[in-house]
Amino acid sequence: MTRIKICGLKRPEDVEYVNQYLPDYVGFVFAESKRKVTDAQAEELSGKLDKKIISVGVFVNEPAEHVIKLVKKGIIRMVQLHGDEDAEYILKLRENLEETAKIIKAVRVQCREQILEAEKLPCDYLLLDTWQKGAY
């Protein structure tokens, strides 16, 4: 089944658009980016989201405590990791979050072996991404 995620919401009008079209997921970027949001911005925007839409926090090497706080406050309902987060980091999230908070791990791959290794991670979904030196 195809699922749709629109990422990088930052403005109130972005929420108006997604509420009209109802994608499955929307992403709030907490990593360094021109689309980065603060906790307060994400809280305000997620509060206006249609409840059918699952909010996803996108992170790169973020302290686990910050991710956990955002989920527990209900600002995000799903976690997408794009950095160097390993199995230990993911397990720490799992220990502190409800089962309903799914975890996506993005893995930058260059070869088949990296995909096979990534399959061992304790995440709910793998997102295979293009490998580019120094980029997440």
For each of these PLM feature ranges, what is it?
Residues M1-Y136:
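Conserved N-terminal beta1-alpha1 strand-loop-helix module at the mouth
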